[in-house]
Curated annotation (Swiss-Prot):
Transmembrane regions: none
Protein name: Ribosomal RNA small subunit methyltransferase A
Main location: cytoplasm
Function: Specifically dimethylates two adjacent adenosines (A1518 and A1519) in the loop of a conserved hairpin near the 3'-end of 16S rRNA in the 30S particle. May play a critical role in biogenesis of 30S subunits.
UniProt xrefs under NCBIfam families: ksgA (TIGR00755)
Species per Swiss-Prot/TrEMBL record: Cupriavidus taiwanensis (strain DSM 17343 / BCRC 17206 / CCUG 44338 / CIP 107171 / LMG 19424 / R1) (Ralstonia taiwanensis (strain LMG 19424))
Regions annotated as coiled coil: none
An annotated GO cellular component: cytosol
Amino acid sequence: MRSNVHQGHVARKRFGQNFLVDDTIIHGIVNAISPQAGDVLVEIGPGLGALTDPLLERIPQMQVVELDRDLVERLRRRYGERLQVHAGDALDFDFDKLAVPGRPLRIVGNLPYNISSPLLFHLMEFADHVHDQHFMLQKEVVERMVAEPGSKAFGRLSIMLQVRYYMEHVLDVPPGAFNPPPKVDSAVVRMIPWPRHGDGRLRSPHADCDITVLGDVVTAAFSQRRKVLRNTLSFLRDQVDFDAMGFDLGRRAEEVPVGEYVELARRLGDKASGQAA
């Protein structure tokens, strides 16, 4: 356990700061990431460098995105030219500009739990240029991300992310691994974007579709979780033949596999495109 926890810095609630201090957990995360010398490695919210230190023991240079101005200056003084510090909000950051042809762009971080879902959706915009992502998140969020249909955890977040990524729950992290300790358990998730075929289609287990249409469909489906889809998706009957596609509206939203939502969104998108033409 690290003794120089805050190094004079007071954790700020508005930034959702909980500093990782357990060396066993830290090295478990770094081993899961397995950084290589040729990687373009970017850490979101490095804080006091709990992950940055051991990562830089394995690679010569890396980059970070940090919002807290006090920490930005600390990081620049501490690591010098080995660390390129981007001062700003990861929610607004253009990660595409960090991509280098021929070098894997890898994103890692102990994400602030108060912005984790918006940040995950923001990062989807850059998935075509990202090799993989490893994030520490609230355990409940990770369970929702990797949830299977039919489980209570399965929902909008599960579907939207599983369409774009292969995901794996890597390890659990107890509150005592942080200072100050959060009130919830944490976990690390690995996210690998599905690659694309030469024609641009996603090489995933699910059909490709308009992600905006999918988001609208899934939001409507889960708007009343306790009711069957006949109540939440009936407004789409004039746009798609549910019976013809074998889509059973007698189910609840969490009982429908990801692929069926994607196929529904694809048909709706095709119909909208045909009408526009």
